[in-house]
C-alpha cells in the first residue's frame, strides 16, 4: 500500500478487489461493535449500558443493519470476491469497464461517512433499516439524520448498480476462447444471477427513498394519508427491493460453496446445469414474494394466499442446491480443511435458517411471529451465518492466490470452531424468544425473557473472539515474515478442477494472462 496513486486511480480488477475486501473488513468490524453494544444492552432486563436512551438503541440497530448489509457483505462478497475471481475464472484480461470499476468502489467510503455522520446529527436515525414512514417522516425525525442516511443509501446504491452493469458486461462479452456460458464456473453464474436483481431492484429502492426525501423536505405527501398518500406504498416499494436483496447477499456465497465442496470432495459438482437454473430461479422468484414481509398491513386474503404459496416455492430451487452439494460430497474423498469446514458450516446453518423461514411464510402464523425475535433469528441464520460463513470459506479458499502465501491451517480451524460455537448460542435462542412473543426493536423486556437473552449475549461475546482470531490469521498470512509460499494450485486440484485460477501463479501477475487461455474441454477430471 506504499503507492497511493496506484490505489486511488487503479483500474486493475485485483487491486480494486483488494480495496473492497479491506473496506468490507473495516465496515464489518464497525457493524460487529454495534451488534455487541446491542447485545450488552439486552443481556439483562432493565436499562443497561445505554442508560435508558431508547432512541440511541434504535440508532445502533439501524447502523448495524446498514453497515453489515451495504458495507460489509455486498462489498466483500460481490466487490471483493467478484472482482478478484470473475475475470480470472472466465479467462478475461480485466473487467469490461475498468474505470467504472474504480468509481464503483470510491463511491462507498463517502457513503459510509454519510451513514456514520447521520448518527451524530441531532438524535440520529433510529428508523431501523427499513426506514418506514411515518417514523422516518419529518414529524418523528425532525433533524437531518434520516436525510443523511438516505443520501448514504443513494450513493451505495449507485455503486452497486454500476458494479452490476460491469459484471453483466464482463461475463457476457469477455469470456476467453472456448469458455461458453455452460462451461463457466458456478461462481461466475452466481455473480451473474446476483447482478441482474441488483440492476432491477435498487432503482426501485432509489425511487422509494427519493419519495421519502421529498416528503421530508419539499412537503410532498407520498406517505401521508392527509395529502392522499399511503405509507403502505413505501412498504411495497422497499420490500420489492428488500427481498431480492436477501438473495443478492446469499447467491455469490452459494457459488463459492459450490467450488469449495467440489475441490475438497475430489469430485465435479453434482448437477451443474441444475445448480445454474436453480440460481437463476432464485433470482427471478425473489421478485415475486416481497409482500410476505407485509402480512400484517391488511392485505387481501387472496393476496396473502398467493404470497404464502410463492414464498414456499422458493424452497424448491434452494433445496436443489443443498441436495446437489450433499450429492457432490457423497462418496467423495473429503478433506476437512478450513475452507471446507466453513462451507459445510454455511450449508448447515443456511438450511436451519431456511427451514425456520418456512414457518412465518404461512400468513396465519406470521400474524403471531411478525416483528418478533423469530424473524431476527431466521434472517441472521441465513445472513449472519450462511452468507458470512461462505465469505470466510471463500477467503480461505482463495487467500493463497491473493497473498501468494499460505495461511496457518490450525489457527484457521480454531477460528471456525470458535465462530461456530459463538453464533449458534447467539441466534438459536432468538427462535424461542420470538415464539414467546418478544418484539424486536425494544431495548427493555420482561423478566421472563431474561434467560434466553443472557445466553444470546454470551454467544455474541464468543463470536467477537472468533473475529479476533480471523484477523490474527489474516495478519500472519499477509505478513512479510510468512515464508510459506503458495503454489499455483495449493489444494492440488489440477486433476479435479476445471477452473482457471489454479493455472496461474500465486499471486497472479499484474496482468493475469500473458496470452488469453483457450478452454478446449468441459471435463478435465482424470481418474
From Swiss-Prot:
GO terms for cellular component: mitochondrial inner membrane; respiratory chain complex IV. It catalyses: 4 Fe(II)-[cytochrome c] + O2 + 8 H(+)(in) = 4 Fe(III)-[cytochrome c] + 2 H2O + 4 H(+)(out). Heme a3 binds at residue 378. It is a multi-pass membrane protein. It is an enzyme of class 7 (translocase). Binds 2 heme A groups non-covalently per subunit. Fe(II)-heme a binds at residues 64, 380. Cu cation binds at residues 243, 292-293. The chain crosses the membrane at residues 18-38, 59-79, 103-123, 149-169, 186-206, 246-266, 269-289, 312-332, 339-359, 375-395, 414-434, 454-474. Keywords: Calcium, Copper, Electron transport, Heme, Iron, Magnesium, Membrane, Metal-binding, Mitochondrion, Mitochondrion inner membrane, Respiratory chain, Translocase, Transmembrane, Transmembrane helix, Transport. It comes from the Eukaryota. It is found in: Mitochondrion inner membrane. There is a cross-link at residues 243-247 (1'-histidyl-3'-tyrosine (His-Tyr)). Mg(2+) binds at residues 370-371. Its EC number is 7.1.1.9. GO terms for molecular function: cytochrome-c oxidase activity; heme binding; metal ion binding. Pathway: Energy metabolism; oxidative phosphorylation. Component of the cytochrome c oxidase (complex IV, CIV), a multisubunit enzyme composed of a catalytic core of 3 subunits and several supernumerary subunits. The complex exists as a monomer or a dimer and forms supercomplexes (SCs) in the inner mitochondrial membrane with ubiquinol-cytochrome c oxidoreductase (cytochrome b-c1 complex, complex III, CIII). Component of the cytochrome c oxidase, the last enzyme in the mitochondrial electron transport chain which drives oxidative phosphorylation. The respiratory chain contains 3 multisubunit complexes succinate dehydrogenase (complex II, CII), ubiquinol-cytochrome c oxidoreductase (cytochrome b-c1 complex, complex III, CIII) and cytochrome c oxidase (complex IV, CIV), that cooperate to transfer electrons derived from NADH and succinate to molecular oxygen, creating an electrochemical gradient over the inner membrane that drives transmembrane transport and the ATP synthase. Belongs to the heme-copper respiratory oxidase family. This is Cytochrome c oxidase subunit 1. It comes from Oenothera berteroana. The gene is COX1.
Amino acid at each position: 500500500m506504499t503507492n497511493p496513486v496506484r490505489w486511488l486511480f487503479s483500474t486493475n480488477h485485483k487491486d480494486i478487489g483488494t480495496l473492497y475486501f479491506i473496506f468490507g473488513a473495516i465496515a464489518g468490524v464497525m457493524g460487529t461493535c454495534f451488534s455487541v453494544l446491542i447485545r450488552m444492552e439486552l443481556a439483562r432486563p432493565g436499562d443497561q449500558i445505554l442508560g435508558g436512551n431508547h432512541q440511541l438503541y434504535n440508532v445502533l440497530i439501524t447502523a448495524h443493519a446498514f453497515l453489515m448489509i451495504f458495507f460489509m457483505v455486498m462489498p466483500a462478497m460481490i466487490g471483493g470476491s467478484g472482482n478478484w475471481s470473475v475475470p480470472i475464472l472466465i479467462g478475461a484480461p480485466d473487467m469490461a469497464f475498468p474505470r467504472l470499476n474504480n468509481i464503483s468502489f470510491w463511491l462507498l467510503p463517502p457513503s459510509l461517512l454519510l451513514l456514520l455522520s447521520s448518527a451524530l446529527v441531532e438524535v440520529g436515525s433510529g428508523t431501523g433499516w427499513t426506514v418506514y414512514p411515518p417514523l422516518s417522516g419529518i414529524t418523528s425525525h425532525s433533524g437531518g439524520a434520516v436525510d443523511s442516511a438516505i443520501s448514504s443509501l443513494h450513493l451505495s446504491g449507485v455503486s452497486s448498480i454500476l458494479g452490476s452493469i460491469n459484471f453483466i458486461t464482463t461475463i457476457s462479452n469477455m469470456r476467453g476462447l472456448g469458455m461458453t456460458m455452460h462451461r463457466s464456473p458456478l461462481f461466475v453464474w452466481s455473480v451473474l444471477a446476483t447482478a441482474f436483481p441488483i440492476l432491477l431492484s435498487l432503482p426501485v429502492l432509489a425511487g422509494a427513498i427519493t419519495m421519502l426525501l421529498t416528503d421530508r423536505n419539499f412537503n410532498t405527501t407520498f406517505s401521508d394519508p392527509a395529502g392522499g398518500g399511503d405509507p403502505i406504498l413505501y412498504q411495497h416499494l422497499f420490500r420489492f427491493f428488500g427481498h431480492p436483496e436477501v438473495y443478492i447477499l446469499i447467491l455469490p456465497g452459494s457459488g463459492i460453496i459450490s467450488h469449495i465442496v467440489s475441490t475438497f470432495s475430489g469430485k465435479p459438482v453434482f448437477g451443474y446445469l441444475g445448480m445454474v437454473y436453480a440460481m437463476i430461479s432464485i433470482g427471478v422468484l425473489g421478485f415475486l414474494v416481497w409482500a410476505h414481509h407485509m402480512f400484517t398491513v391488511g392485505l387481501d386474503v387472496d393476496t396473502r394466499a398467493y404470497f404464502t404459496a410463492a414464498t414456499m416455492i422458493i424452497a424448491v430451487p434452494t433445496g436443489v442446491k443443498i441436495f446437489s452439494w450433499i450429492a457432490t460430497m457423497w462418496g467423495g474423498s473429503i478433506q476437512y480443511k478450513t475452507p471446507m469446514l466453513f462451507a459445510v458450516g454455511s450449508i448447515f446453518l443456511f438450511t436451519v435458517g431456511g427451514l425456520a423461514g418456512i414457518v412465518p411464510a404461512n400468513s396465519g402464523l406470521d400474524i403471531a411471529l411478525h416483528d418478533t425475535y423469530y424473524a431476527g433469528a431466521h434472517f441472521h441464520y441465513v445472513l449472519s451465518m450462511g452468507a458470512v460463513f461462505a465469505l470466510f470459506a471463500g477467503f480461505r479458499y482463495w487467500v493463497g492466490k491473493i497473498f501468494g502465501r499460505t495461511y496457518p491451517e490450525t489457527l484457521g480451524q480454531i477460528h471456525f470452531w470458535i465462530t461456530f460455537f459463538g453464533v449458534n448460542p447467539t441466534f438459536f435462542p432468538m427462535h424461542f424468544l420470538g415464539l414467546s412473543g418478544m418484539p424486536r426493536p425494544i431495548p427493555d423486556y420482561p423478566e421472563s425473557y431474561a434467560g434466553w437473552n443472557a445466553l444470546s449475549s454470551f454467544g455474541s461475546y464468543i463470536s467477537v473472539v472468533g473475529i479476533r482470531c480471523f484477523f490474527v490469521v489474516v495478519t500472519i498470512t499477509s505478513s512479510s515474515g510468512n515464508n510459506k509460499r503458495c503454489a499455483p494450485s495449493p489444494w492440488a486440484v489440477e486433476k479435479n478442477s476445471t477452473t482457471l485460477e489454479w493455472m496461474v501463479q500465486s499471486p497472479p501477475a499484474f496482468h493475469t494472462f500473458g496470452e488469453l487461455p483457450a478452454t478446449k474441454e468441459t471435463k478435465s477430471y482424470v481418474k
